[in-house]
Amino acid sequence: MESGSGAGRAIYWALKNVLLGPVITRVFRPIQEGTENVPDKGPAIIASNHLSFADWLFMPVALDRRITFVAKSDYFTRAGIKGWAQKRFFAGTGQVPIDRTGGRASEGALRAGLKVLQRGELFGIYPEGTRSHDGRLYKGRTGVARLALLSGAPVIPSAIIGTDIIAPPGKILTKIVSPTVKFGRPLDFSRYEGMSEDRFILRSITDEIMYAIMELSGQEYVDMYAPAAKEAAAREAKAHEVDEVSPQA
C-alpha cells in the first residue's frame, strides 16, 4: 500500500489526530519553532538532522501538513499478521519503502522523493543517511541536493533536539523530556537548475543545507560521513578494550 493512497492517508490522519499524535503531545509536550517557514501548500523538502528512531514520531506532530519519509523495505514485506500490521503502521505514519541494499539505496530514495514532491507534498529526508551515534552532526549525502535540483522544490532546513535523550541509540525509551523541532527559512537552489549531475555543485548545495541545519540544532559539525565515524569509534573502543585486558610488561 503506497503512502499516497486513500487508505494510507486515512491511517495517517487517524494516527496523527486520534491515536498516536494526542498521546505524544500530552506526554512529551514537544516544542515547535519556525513552522511558518513551511509552506501551506506545494512541494517542499524537509531536511533534518537525525538523532534517534523517535525523530519520525515528532516531525509529523509538529506540522499540520502530511510529511513522507522513506523506510527500509523490510518493514513492508514481513509475513503474517504482525507483518501486515507493521506494514499498515509504517505506511500510515507517512513512510514509503525503499531497498537500502547496495548502490540502489540512494536511487530508491530519490525516486520515492520525486513521486511525493510531484504530488505537491512534503518529503522528509535525513541527509546524514543514518542516526548520529554521538549527538554530533555529520557530513551530508548529496542525494538531498539532487532531489532539490530535479524537483525544483525548496529545501526547508530542520533540526530536532532532545530525541537522543528520549531514545538513545540502541534503546527504545529512557526519559520523558520535551523535544524541540525547528524549521528554518526555505533555501532556493533554482539558480543551479540543470546542474544535477555536477558533483561540485551537489557538494556545495549539500554543505549549505548542512550548515543551515547546524545553525538550527547547535550541534558540533564533523566533516565525515556518519557510518565511517561510527565504525572508527567502534574500532577505537575495541582497541581500548584490548589494551585494558593485555598483560602489563
Residues of each region from the PLM?
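Short gly/ser/thr-rich secondary-structure transition/capping motifs
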Residues: 25-32, 105-107, 163-165
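A generic local structural motif
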Residues: 18, 30-35, 54-56, 83, ...
